[in-house]
Design a protein with these regions (language model features):
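Regulatory sensory/coupling modules that transmit signals to nucleotide-handling catalytic cores
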Residues: 1-17, 115, 121, 125, ...
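Conserved long alpha-helical elements within nucleotide-processing catalytic cores of c-di-GMP signaling
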Residues: 21-24, 30-50, 57-87, 93-97, ...
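Hydrophobic pocket-lining residues within nucleotide cofactor-binding pockets
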Residues: 31, 56, 107, 138-140
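A short glycine-enriched loop-to-beta-strand structural element that forms part of the catalytic core
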Residues: 50, 103, 128-156
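Extended, non-catalytic scaffold segments that flank or surround catalytic motifs
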Residues: 78, 118-119, 132-137
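Short catalytic/binding micro-motifs of nucleotide second-messenger systems
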Residues: 84-89, 118-130
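Short, conserved charged micro-motifs
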Residues: 109-114, 145
Length: 156
């Protein structure tokens, strides 16, 4: 009887993990998805943090001219290079489509700039397809910009 209950608990734990992954992970990139980005933004907005928003250029053109498979490759290439370019202990996620976000906790402006340079370096290493993106960032004491980031995430 105890073994049966233990098996049930383990099975429920696995199912909960799978559901959580589906709710919070972007299947295409393996990065946290818009739901997780919104949750982090809501929970962390009061703390000392910076927010960087990235918007891939030319995704629609790539999709239309080279096909969605190539567009998916473009998105995945950027996602991998974004993750490589940002310090391991910082958060990066995909908000949807061609939009990505990074949250930096307890960092200086110089740290953010260094991470942005690292992302740029990683993206230039991708020789198979040129990665192009504008990036903007705000600091936690700039509530107007953070509110704008929330609006972007909510799709308004």
């Amino acid at each position: 009887m105890i073994l049966y209950e233990l098996i049930k608990v383990l099975r429920y734990a696995r199912v909960n993990r799978e559901v959580k992954n589906k709710v919070y992970l972007d299947e295409a990139t393996g990065l946290p998805n818009k739901n997780k980005c919104e949750e982090i933004l809501t929970l962390e907005a009061e703390q000392n943090m910076s927010i960087c928003v990235f918007d891939l250029n030319n995704l629609r053109i790539i999709d239309n001219q080279q096909g969605h498979e190539r567009g998916d490759f473009y998105i995945n290439s950027f996602a991998k290079n974004l993750r490589k370019g940002v310090d391991e202990n910082q958060f990066v996620g995909r908000c949807g489509g061609d939009e990505f976000i990074a949250f930096f906790k307890n960092v200086t402006k110089e740290d953010v700039k260094r991470n942005l340079e690292n992302i740029k370096k990683e993206c230039t290493k991708c020789s198979e397809i040129p990665l192009s993106y504008p990036a903007g960032f705000a600091y936690s004491n700039d509530f107007f910009k953070i509110n704008n980031a929330r609006i972007v995430l909510s799709g308004r």
